Regions:
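A short, highly charged nucleic-acid-interacting micro-segment common to nuclease
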Residues: 174-186
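Sec-dependent N-terminal signal peptides of Gram-positive bacterial secreted proteins and lipoproteins
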Residues: 2-22
């Protein structure tokens, strides 16, 4: 444990040394799940923004378009927005032109919770991102930041597994993970996705069965880096105080090899099928810890904190130590 604590402090210092942080001053509440945005029109997006503004202002209803299908697309986008946890229930009016909201909290509680979530997200992002980072470096930096921010909530999982009615079990969302410092696989995925959305990096979600038990579900992100899609699993890479890269940047075949016999997964995406074909990040998988050096390279370490090599984050070349 002492080795890991020393190494983590070294990694953080290396990632921050000599460079001012690129400050985000506010969260973009208008972000849309990437694949959902793909089937929304520009007009849908404007109504979506209008609805977000209405929720933030605690309006009881918002007037949408006269097109019911378009309004369903807007609702689909809303349901994937991290601030939507403040809405307990929504319903359309009889003409399906207005969306009415019932809020889960008082006005002051809602404002406090959203402000807290924004503050914690900004702190996490600004504490990890440096000016000039490319997409891979941003993805790596936020991977480390998410793993450092929350721990896996085994008590929650045990309670879920023993619950008589899982549909009534409290919903997982970002605020819950940030406020408790704990979460499950969905929490890691949602946090990672939301952070990357703020940085303009495309992130989707995979759902699947990773243990051979069809009732034992799992969720993890897929990230688009340099035009290629890669599967990542921050839940499995959580080493307690830092992230390993054993499951970062996997191809579909590498992901299949990481599970057990009968392992299946599918993309929780309106895109349909997304291929993760590239294996050029495979050298990263040997790292039990890493540090971004600031010159477009990642220093990889083994479980004892010994440097094992350097990975070029631009060319994806690896030089063993």
């Amino acid at each position: 444990m002492r080795i890991w604590k020393t190494l983590v402090c070294t990694l953080i210092a290396a990632m921050l040394a000599g460079t001012a942080l690129a400050e985000l001053t506010e969260m973009n509440h208008y972000v849309v799940k990437a694949d959902v945005r793909a089937y929304m029109t520009d007009e849908d997006l404007e109504f979506y923004k209008k609805a977000i503004d209405a929720i933030l202002a605690r309006e009881k209803e918002v007037r949408l378009s006269d097109d019911y299908d378009a309004n369903l697309r807007v609702l689909g986008a809303l349901s994937n927005n991290p601030i939507y946890f403040v809405v307990e229930k929504e319903e359309f009016n009889s003409k399906h032109t207005k969306l009415r909201f019932k809020y889960a909290y008082s006005e002051s509680e809602q404002a406090e919770k959203i402000a807290y979530m924004d503050e914690e997200m900004l702190k996490m992002i600004n504490g990890a991102i440096q000016p000039g980072m490319n997409e891979l470096e941003q993805a790596l930096a936020m991977y480390q930041a998410v793993v450092a921010r929350i721990d896996y909530d085994y008590e929650w999982l045990d309670a879920l597994n023993t619950s008589d009615d899982k549909f009534l079990f409290p919903q997982i969302e970002i605020y819950q993970a940030l406020s408790t410092g704990k979460g499950v696989c969905h929490s890691y995925t949602f946090l990672y996705e939301y952070a990357l959305q703020q940085l303009g990096v495309e992130c989707l979600r995979y759902i699947g069965n990773t243990t051979g038990d069809p009732d034992d579900g799992h969720m993890w992100p897929v990230v688009r880096i340099g035009g290629e899609y890669y599967q990542c699993d921050p839940t499995w890479d959580d080493q307690g105080e830092t992230a390993s890269l054993q499951y970062f940047g996997m191809s579909d075949s590498e992901r299949l090899e990481s599970g057990v016999e009968g392992f299946e997964f599918s993309l929780d995406s309106a895109y349909g099928e997304v291929k993760c074909d590239s294996e050029d990040l495979k050298p990263l998988h040997q790292a039990m810890a890493f540090a971004l050096s600031g010159d477009h390279s990642a220093i990889l370490y083994d479980s004892f904190g010994t440097e094992i090599g350097e990975f070029d984050t631009e060319t994806h070349g690896f030089s063993a130590k």
